Every structure is written in structure tokens, then in C-alpha cells.
Amino acid sequence: MNFNDFHCGCMKPCETYSYAQYGVQANPPSKSDLPMAVLFQEGEQIFLTDTEIFLEPGYLYLIDFIFLATPEADSFMQITPKINGTLQLLYSFFAPTGSASRNASASGSFTVPVTENSASVSFNLTYPDKVRNIDISGAVSVTLLHKIKGTKC
């Protein structure tokens, strides 16, 4: 797949736009997907259902995330994005805490080309069994970048 494969191929630019931002404020169990709430959402290609962001086919999307959490000292949290239910370790973020601090943060970005069928994106939180409780907050931003070549404008 090349960069030029994502251009629309129409005589004029595609006039579709869609972007959203979702907030997270929770204390979920380890190995669970983070619940999100809509902060804002424009367009029809991106929508949220509790823990999953759905992306309509035919577009390239940019996903940005930032999270701040309070696991216990000498511990960690790990945020792993899931695309269509599959953990994406390439985009995973491991955030350790030190002996004097309980704060951990994670951030990253990645693109998702959605060609034929809609795709779902979620964020899985993992932390050690010794951590009794973790408070996490953050935001996920989703931006439709452009139409993928070969799909109708």
C-alpha cells in the first residue's frame, strides 16, 4: 500500500469530513476496554458505542490518544489499542510508576485504513494484580484524513 493509493481519484476533492473526541474517566478492572463518552462528534463516518469507536469504510483515519492514571507505586499500566477486536501491540504503551510516584501517562497516535467493511477501535487497559484500584482519565481524538483511492466520492 502506497501513500498515493489513498487519494480519492475524483476531479474535485471529496467533500466528506468527520472528526470526534471522546473522553475517558473511569476506574475499570484490568484487562478491560476503557469506557468512553462523546466530547464532540461531527460528520457521519465516526461514532461511539460505550467502549468501541466505529469507523465507516472508504477512508483513512488518524487516531490520537492520551491517558493519565494513578496505579500504585512501583507498578505500571499498559494501554493497548484494539482494531476489530485484535490487540495491536505495535501501538501499545507501557507506563511504569516509580517508588515515589503513583502517576503514569500514555500517549500515541496511529492511522487506520478502512477499505471494505467498517472497523472498530477500542483501548484495553492492563495492570498487575497487586494494584487494588486505578483511576484513569484521558481523551481519544479521531480524524478522517481522506478518501481511499478506488472508493466512490
Describe each PLM feature range.
Residues 2-153:
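Extracellular jelly-roll beta-sandwich "head" domains, especially the C-terminal globular C1q domain
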